Amino acid sequence: MPMTTTSTFETHIIEAYRGPVFGETIYGANVLRDISAVFTDVVGGRAGDYEKVLIRGRNAALAEMSERAKQLGANAVIGIRFDYSTVGRSMLMICSSGTAVIANPRIPDASH
């Protein structure tokens, strides 16, 4: 399913708006990953394990949002936004939102 953070598709015409859609995921962090991240913060560099959790969570939120868009009869989602927050001391919540739409490919102008 085509998805974009913009409010339009350059290559598609939006025929109908089906409504807002959301995807939510919550991931727990483990102690070893926390210790590794603290060490990375002190030494410098990237916390690869946390980045993997963020990517997995973001992809899961997008997949959930895509399924909800399909349930509304949509074939695309526009205006996607993400929100990240912590729940308690060891949980990460990732929420995505967007607008489900029916979008059809633009037909190229034959005169050009």
From Swiss-Prot:
Listed InterPro entries: UPF0145_dom_sf, UPF0145_YbjQ-like
HAMAP family, alphabetized: UPF0145 (MF_00338)
Domain of life: Bacteria
Protein name: UPF0145 protein RB3016
Protein family membership: Belongs to the UPF0145 family.
